[in-house]
């Protein structure tokens, strides 16, 4: 073998071998235990970033380890290929989204291969191909027939100048990103899937997911937001309809002093006919996009509609206000306000001088002080007529029962979760397979017209979707009648909700899934991806699995047994202030830094001499120009080094700080491994290891080898603390580098140790391990080698350290066999120079012996 470690030579050779041998292609095999290891599929943006590399390295380490345990391991990869960025890039580069996407896929596929990930490439899929999305379209038509799909109007961002719908990220400070026109909210008909029909199951099954992070489960619980309460109906004077509100606190009902409705509510619209101030307020609300996160912090505003509602229990008239914090799409578009016991209602009532009536006593039994804020804690009722003196639970039930008996209340379970709106007014997505006949009938596209293919050879004007701009595209005939196709496309979360199942049978032509293959591989054993997907993707992913189960395609309830959310990758960020006061971010690669004795950055400048401001470590991002290109690092150090650093620098679920000095350290370690194998093999053949003939030192070294195997196995397999596994291998390597290699058994032991080290490193650094395994004459390819097993006998401590004291003072530490008698220990202690010195010419009056630990000789 060559003396120097040259990753650029060995890595491409090993990758070619895997390709030619199709090493990682698998098929169902009932005789083997399966393991399905899946990383979230990438969006083909053009280049891999370090976040991808971290995600996929973790997955590859787990997959290769499970393979070495003898399991049938599926690790597939594909491309989440539809989406808005392709439209922007196509306009910018004067091309169409399809060629841009396919070029990116080809480029990124090479990057994945360059990193040595062991994927089954025969299962690769791209979600933008009709072969993939046809089954999603077919499934959608079946959900429609089951009553799980419906159409209703819903608000979108509308640019009146371009006459087009904008995604949230295309609205900048309330204006269109392209023409800067003020964006309006417009109601348009859209398709929805009834995820709410599965709300209870999605919530309850979270308890089955023992190996999902609690943070993700909590986020999903809160997102689904199940609550129990009462729906209450109010009569409104001079208004044709009643108003219905939902409350989780009926115990506070006697303190309800006003109602609030959304600006879009029919009551507000009616009142606005003769109220210009209200009409202007409704207009203002229509054009503010309100995300829930902003709701909490934005200024609460409202206008009195002039209508009065009648409190069903007191008969009092209470005002009805239109307010910007009530949304039509949530619940009934109306809420009851109890300003004494709800902080938002309190602030609104204080601002507009509305009545605040306390009905709950403070914890000490006194009347609450409402001069500064509402009392939101639960407590005992007062000021509430017949309900005075009841505690929260008793009052909840008594008031709910009374309202129900009067016919104006009903107990209800409510969810925060809303149905999934899957319509997008974009081009680069799967066409929604619905048609409208001439007579207005809406129906699913007939099976013989599926898939509805998205034309790829299009011209993008950057404004209107090509399939909306071309009136001919939508024309079709159904049952001999002219019909128009739906020109909206699916939300791209649709494709990523079921791809994991299609990987089990990517070539299947008879339907969405081949149940036999799907049920062999599913559920996924471990799913790896970022925590940012906790509610959207990971909820739709679970929902789709249940839909496929209820369609008879899969027989499990949940799609993935374990979820691992990898931490973000951080890097140093630097900027200098330009002439106009703007920040110019400089890549850490281009920063020349000075550090103090603790390694902290104290000064930095760039090649042009700008003094740089160092802002610390932050997430790698385009905006701060602090992304590190994985390709550059692989070309500089090799894929194995990059992979090793990624797994060693921090626990998988914590943030990782990119430090090139750490990468250099990983590289030095691999060079040491190479050097040790080189020096060992240069001495020629090795004799068989005879464990019965080993010296104490050799036994101790062998004990370290097998203890390391046991620790690494536990760290990777059970604890998934990959960084501590690598640290243990490094520690063993340090001992091996110092071990004697002269004797026959020294070299036999070194051979056993190196074969173990190479196999333990294999999941992390597969190229160098593949090569060194061959140099060590390991059996077959390392890809088919079994994981090393710790020898229990070798780990038994057959000697122990005994502390020897004379009159309570430590004079020596001696190594003795575990089964040595007290006499043997005394004899051995007497051979120590220092002990003998203190025993010379004196009488031993007493011996205190703690077996295997301590020998104290009391002399006088």
Swiss-Prot record:
Subcellular location as annotated: Cytoplasm
Any one biological process term the GO annotation gives: leucyl-tRNA aminoacylation
Keywords, in A-Z order: Aminoacyl-tRNA synthetase, ATP-binding, Cytoplasm, Ligase, Nucleotide-binding, Protein biosynthesis
Main localization of the protein described in the UniProt heading: cytoplasm
Stretches that traverse the bilayer: none
GO cellular component: cytosol
Reactions catalysed according to its record: tRNA(Leu) + L-leucine + ATP = L-leucyl-tRNA(Leu) + AMP + diphosphate
Motif ('KMSKS' region): 619-623
Gene3D superfamilies: 2.20.28.290, 3.10.20.590, HUPs, Isoleucyl-tRNA Synthetase, Domain 1
Binding positions for ATP per the UniProt entry: 622
Enzyme class: ligase
Record EC number: 6.1.1.4
Residue interval(s) of motif 'HIGH' region: 42-52
One Gene Ontology MF term: ATP binding
Protein family: Belongs to the class-I aminoacyl-tRNA synthetase family.
HAMAP family referenced in this protein's UniProt entry, alphabetically: Leu_tRNA_synth_B
Protein name (record): Leucine--tRNA ligase
Organism: Escherichia coli O7:K1 (strain IAI39 / ExPEC)
Gene expressing this chain: leuS
């Amino acid at each position: 073998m060559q003396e120097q470690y040259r990753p650029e030579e060995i890595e491409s050779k090993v990758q070619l071998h895997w390709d030619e041998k199709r090493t990682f292609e698998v098929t169902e095999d009932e005789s083997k235990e399966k393991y399905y290891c899946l990383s979230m599929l990438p969006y083909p943006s053009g280049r891999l970033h370090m976040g991808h590399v971290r995600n996929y390295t973790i997955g590859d380490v787990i997959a290769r380890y499970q393979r070495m345990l003898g399991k049938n391991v599926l690790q597939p990869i594909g491309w989440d290929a539809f989406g808005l960025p392709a439209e922007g890039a196509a306009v910018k580069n004067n091309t169409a989204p399809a060629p841009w996407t396919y070029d990116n896929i080809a480029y990124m596929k090479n990057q994945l291969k360059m990193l040595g990930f062991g994927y089954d490439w025969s299962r690769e899929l791209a979600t933008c191909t009709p072969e993939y999305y046809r089954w999603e379209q077919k499934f959608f038509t079946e959900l429609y027939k089951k009553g799980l799909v419906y159409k209703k109007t819903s608000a979108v961002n509308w640019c009146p100048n371009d006459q087009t719908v904008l995604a949230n990220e295309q609205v900048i400070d309330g204006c269109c990103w392209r023409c800067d026109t003020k964006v309006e909210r417009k109601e348009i008909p859209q398709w929805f899937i009834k995820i709410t029909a599965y709300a209870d199951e999605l919530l309850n099954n979270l308890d089955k997911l023992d190996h999902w992070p609690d943070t993700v489960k909590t986020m999903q619980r809160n997102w689904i937001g199940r609550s129990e309460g009462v729906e209450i109906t109010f009569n409104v004077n001079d208004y044709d309809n009643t108003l219905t509100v939902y409350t989780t606190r009926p115990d506070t009902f006697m303190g309800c002093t006003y109602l609030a409705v959304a600006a879009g509510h029919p009551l507000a619209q009616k009142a606005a006919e003769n109220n210009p101030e209200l009409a202007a307020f409704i207009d203002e609300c229509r054009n503010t996009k309100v995300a829930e996160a902003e709701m909490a912090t934005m200024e609460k505003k409202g206008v009195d509609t002039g209508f009065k509602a009648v409190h069903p229990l007191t008969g009092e008239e209470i005002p009805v206000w239109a307010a910007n914090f009530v949304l039509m799409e949530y619940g009934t578009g109306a809420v009851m306000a109890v300003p004494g016991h709800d902080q938002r209602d309190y602030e609104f009532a204080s601002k507009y001088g509305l009545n605040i009536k306390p009905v709950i006593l403070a914890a000490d039994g006194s009347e609450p002080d409402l001069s500064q804020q509402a009392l939101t804690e639960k407590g005992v009722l007062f000021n509430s007529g017949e309900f005075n003196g009841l505690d929260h639970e008793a009052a909840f039930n008594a008031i709910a029962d009374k309202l129900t008996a009067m016919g104006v209340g009903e107990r209800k379970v409510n969810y925060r979760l809303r149905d999934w709106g899957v319509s997008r007014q974009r081009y680069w997505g799967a066409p929604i397979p619905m048609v409208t006949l001439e007579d207005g009938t809406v129906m699913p596209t007939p099976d013989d017209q599926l898939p509805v293919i998205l034309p790829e050879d299009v011209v993008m004007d950057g404004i209107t979707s090509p399939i909306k701009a071309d009136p001919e595209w939508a024309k079709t005939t159904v049952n001999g009648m002219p019909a128009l196709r739906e020109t909206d496309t699916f939300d791209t979360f649709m494709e990523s909700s079921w791809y994991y199942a299609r990987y089990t049978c990517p070539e299947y032509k008879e339907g969405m899934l081949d149940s036999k293959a799907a049920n062999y591989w599913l559920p996924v054993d471990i799913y790896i991806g970022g925590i940012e997907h906790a509610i959207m993707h990971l909820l739709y992913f679970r929902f789709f699995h249940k839909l496929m189960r209820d369609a008879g395609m899969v027989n499990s309830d949940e799609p993935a047994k374990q979820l691992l959310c990898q931490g973000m990758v951080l890097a140093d960020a630097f900027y200098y202030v330009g002439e106009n006061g703007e920040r110019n971010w400089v890549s850490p690669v281009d920063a020349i830094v000075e550090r103090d004795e603790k390694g902290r950055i104290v000064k930095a400048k760039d090649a042009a001499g700008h003094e740089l401001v160092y802002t610390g470590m932050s997430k790698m991002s385009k905006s701060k120009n602090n992304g590190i290109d994985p390709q550059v690092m692989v070309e500089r150090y090799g894929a194995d080094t990059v992979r090793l650093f990624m797994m060693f620098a921090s626990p998988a679920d914590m943030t990782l700080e990119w430090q090139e000095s750490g990468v250099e350290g990983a590289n030095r370690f691999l060079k040491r491994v190479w050097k040790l194998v080189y020096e060992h093999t240069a001495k020629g053949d090795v004799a068989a290891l005879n464990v019965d003939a080993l010296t104490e030192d050799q036994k101790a070294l062998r004990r370290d080898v097998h203890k390391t195997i046991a620790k690494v196995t536990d760290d990777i397999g059970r604890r998934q603390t990959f960084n501590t596994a690598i640290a243990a291998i490094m520690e063993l390597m340090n001992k091996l580098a110092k071990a004697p290699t002269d004797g026959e058994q020294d070299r036999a032991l070194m051979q056993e140790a190196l074969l173990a080290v190479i196999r333990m490193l294999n999941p992390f650094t597969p190229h160098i391990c593949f090569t060194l395994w061959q140099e060590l004459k390991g059996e077959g390819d390392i890809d088919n080698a079994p994981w090393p097993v710790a020898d229990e006998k070798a780990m038994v401590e057959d000697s122990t350290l005994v502390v020897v004291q004379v009159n309570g003072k430590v004079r020596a530490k001696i190594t003795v066999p575990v089964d040595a008698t007290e006499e043997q220990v005394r004899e051995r202690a007497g051979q120590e120079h220092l002990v003998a010195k203190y025993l010379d010419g004196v009488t031993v009056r007493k011996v205190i012996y703690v077996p295997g630990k301590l020998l104290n000789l009391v002399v006088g």
